[in-house]
């Protein structure tokens, strides 16, 4: 979606910052020292919506990420693209043109102001809404979507405060609507293969994971009026913590059955100095440019350590500033061996095709041949053709539609989105309290202990 005018961002971000200060004082940096309020509805773990012969879709935000979803949905069967909403006419025109060029009916359009999306939500011919907007709008739009009787599918992160996480959970439980944060990396070929290997016991009992979003994005600072950098840059002036934890953390969480037999217990976090963005601004912009007037406070490298209730450990890192190759780490260590990503490599004590665990096995093909996930076996070629981060976007959307049309539970629920996203807030709370540990809220209200782990779903 087109960037919200700066005053809207500053107002929203200011409220977030004020909320964090209040939370730190009230909770002494302990996010779950206050017991959750009683559940209003019922748990949505394993929620199955009534089968939909045709999935009717509305889109809020069709800029960069949102337009990618429009493109992918045009390749899916059993869907209708009913309506789109954005505040920027150019991206609306592009989306409409693309949909029509794909021989699909012209969608209805909603625009004009930041709340025009509510007109889209008033329609009674939409089943699900895809939300691809600046971060501060994710939770409010998802809540409004569920309140309107529709299922919400939200870009990452799901929320920016602990309170927003609880509001999303409470709304999903009360309305019995899906609220899925669309963590696409969980549908990558490597990630799904590793999930299959974990479920088959290849790595033994799991002990430790490492997750990251290391992606040099300083160039986005040059996006001043439109596109992601026009609003995302400001978050580096408002928070010091892990701004974007879910891409790496999502897969590790599913490997470890987080919220389905285990859960995050507490976190400790620290950050490096915040130097890189100011240096980049000084080098790339005139001295009097706005980018040189900002005070960048988010540490160039954020590192958090999570302890789970079962005693496992997870390292989570965030760095979108320093010059280095892309990585999500994607490391999972068990009693029989380890998988690590970027580049992909495996070492196991038993069952390693004769390779010693003292050296990495970099030849992935034989592992794919044995452990490739059924979803990628079924639609991998189609995913590679249609693209979207190597095909993971297509697999995710395909799977979402499949579940809705066949009466199956989604692979990710509101509790997952809340638990993975809340690292954003808790990392800052820990850092502001000399890296003392901060407890995770139990968004499942205890239901994690008996929830069924995600299986190796087919198609």
Swiss-Prot record:
Q: How would you classify this enzyme at the top EC level? A: hydrolase
Under the heading InterPro entries, the entry gives: Gfo/Idh/MocA-like_OxRdtase_N, Gfo/Idh/MocA_oxidrdct_glycsds, Glyco_hydro_109_C, NAD(P)-bd_dom_sf, TAT_signal, TAT_signal_bac_arc
Please list which residues make up the signal peptide: 1-31
What top-level branch of life does the organism fall under? Bacteria
Detail which positions bind NAD(+).
Answer: 64-65, 86, 135-138, 155-156, 184, 244
As for PTM, the annotation reads: Predicted to be exported by the Tat system. The position of the signal peptide cleavage has not been experimentally proven.
Which cysteines form disulfides? Answer: none
Q: What's one GO MF term for it?
A: nucleotide binding
What does the record say about how the cofactor binds?
Answer: Binds 1 NAD(+) per subunit. The NAD(+) cannot dissociate.
Instruction: Indicate which residues the UniProt annotation says bind substrate.
Output: 213, 232, 244-247, 326
Q: Give the required cofactors.
A: NAD(+)
Q: Which UniProt keywords apply?
A: Glycosidase, Hydrolase, NAD, Signal
> Per the UniProt record, which EC number(s) apply here?
3.2.1.-
Check the record and name the Pfam families matching this protein: GFO_IDH_MocA, Glyco_hydro_109_C, TAT_signal
Family named by the database record = Belongs to the Gfo/Idh/MocA family. Glycosyl hydrolase 109 subfamily.
The protein's role, per its UniProt record: Glycosidase.
What is the name listed in the Swiss-Prot or TrEMBL entry for this protein?
Glycosyl hydrolase family 109 protein 1
Q: Which organism is it from?
A: Shewanella sp. (strain MR-7)
Q: Mind giving the lineage of the organism this protein is from?
A: Bacteria, Pseudomonadati, Pseudomonadota, Gammaproteobacteria, Alteromonadales
């Amino acid at each position: 979606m087109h960037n919200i005018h700066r005053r809207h961002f500053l107002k929203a971000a200011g409220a977030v910052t004020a909320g964090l200060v209040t939370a730190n004082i009230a909770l002494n940096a302990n996010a779950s020292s206050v017991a959750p309020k009683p559940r209003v509805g019922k748990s949505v773990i394993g929620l199955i919506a009534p089968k939909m012969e045709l999935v009717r879709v509305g889109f809020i935000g069709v800029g960069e990420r949102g337009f990618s979803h429009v493109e992918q949905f045009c390749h899916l069967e059993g869907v209708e693209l009913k309506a789109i909403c954005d505040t920027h006419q150019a991206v609306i025109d592009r989306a409409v043109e693309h949909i029509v060029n794909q021989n699909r009916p012209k969608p209805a359009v909603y625009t004009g102001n930041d709340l025009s999306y509510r007109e889209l939500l008033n329609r009674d011919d939409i089943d699900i809404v895809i939300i691809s907007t600046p971060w501060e709008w994710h939770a409010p739009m998802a809540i409004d979507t569920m309140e309107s009787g529709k299922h919400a599918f939200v870009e990452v992160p799901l929320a920016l405060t602990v309170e927003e996480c609880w509001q999303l959970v409470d709304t999903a439980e009360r309305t019995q609507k899906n609220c899925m944060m669309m963590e696409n990396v969980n549908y990558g070929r490597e990630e799904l293969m590793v999930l299959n290997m974990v479920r088959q016991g290849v790595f033994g009992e799991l002990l430790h994971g490492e997750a990251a979003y290391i992606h040099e994005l300083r160039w986005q600072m040059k996006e001043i009026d439109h596109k992601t950098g026009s609003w995302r840059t400001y978050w580096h002036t408002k928070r010091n913590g892990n701004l974007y934890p879910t891409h790496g953390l999502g897969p590790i969480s599913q490997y470890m059955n987080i919220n389905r037999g285990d859960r995050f217990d507490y976190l400790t976090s620290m950050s490096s100095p915040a130097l890189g963005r100011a240096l980049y601004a000084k080098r790339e912009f005139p001295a009097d440019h706005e980018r040189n007037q900002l005070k960048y406070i988010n540490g160039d490298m954020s590192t958090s350590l999570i302890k789970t209730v079962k005693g496992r450990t997870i390292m989570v890192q965030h760095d979108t500033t320093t010059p280095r190759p892309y990585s999500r780490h994607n490391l999972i260590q068990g009693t029989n061996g380890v998988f690590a990503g970027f580049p992909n490599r495996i070492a196991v004590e038993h069952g390693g095709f004769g390779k010693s665990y003292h050296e990495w096995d970099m030849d992935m093909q034989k592992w794919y041949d044995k452990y490739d996930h059924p979803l990628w076996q079924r639609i991998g070629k189609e995913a590679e053709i249609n693209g979207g981060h190597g095909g993971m976007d297509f697999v995710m959307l395909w799977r979402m539609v499949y579940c809705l049309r066949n009466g199956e539970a989604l692979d990710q629920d509101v509790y997952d989105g809340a638990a993975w996203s809340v690292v954003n807030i808790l990392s800052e709370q820990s850092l502001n309290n000399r890296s003392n540990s901060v407890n995770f809220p139990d968004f499942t209200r205890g239901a994690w202990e008996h929830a069924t782990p995600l299986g190796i779903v087919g198609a």
